Amino acid sequence: MAKKDGAIEIEGTVIESLPNAMFRVELDNGHKVLAHISGKMRMHYIRILPDDRVVVELSPYDLTRGRIVYRYK
């Protein structure tokens, strides 16, 4: 997993699946964010379903949107 400079990584649970590979994720601290799948996860056909535990990478500029970078098994 390549770490991006200044990005915040936090764990959460997928609440619902939205169109265009977007997901609503509830973070461990209670906040809800909108997240999309990272390109590497798309390339390797990693499927994400509601109730999956994931790691979300948030930008310090917009804490309401993020990128799903890892799905726990």
UniProtKB/Swiss-Prot annotation:
Signal peptide extent: none
GO terms for MF: ribosome binding; rRNA binding; translation initiation factor activity
Entry GO CC: cytosol
Keyword Cytoplasm included in the entry's annotation: yes
Keyword annotations of the record: Cytoplasm, Initiation factor, Protein biosynthesis, RNA-binding, rRNA-binding
Subcellular location: Cytoplasm
Record flagged with keyword Cytoplasm: yes
UniProt domain S1-like: residue ranges: 1-73
Residues spanning the membrane: none
Entries under PROSITE patterns matching the protein: S1_IF1_TYPE
Pfam families xref list: eIF-1a (PF01176)
Entry's family note: Belongs to the IF-1 family.
Assembly description: Component of the 30S ribosomal translation pre-initiation complex which assembles on the 30S ribosome in the order IF-2 and IF-3, IF-1 and N-formylmethionyl-tRNA(fMet); mRNA recruitment can occur at any time during PIC assembly.
Job of this protein: One of the essential components for the initiation of protein synthesis. Stabilizes the binding of IF-2 and IF-3 on the 30S subunit to which N-formylmethionyl-tRNA(fMet) subsequently binds. Helps modulate mRNA selection, yielding the 30S pre-initiation complex (PIC). Upon addition of the 50S ribosomal subunit IF-1, IF-2 and IF-3 are released leaving the mature 70S translation initiation complex.
Protein name (record): Translation initiation factor IF-1
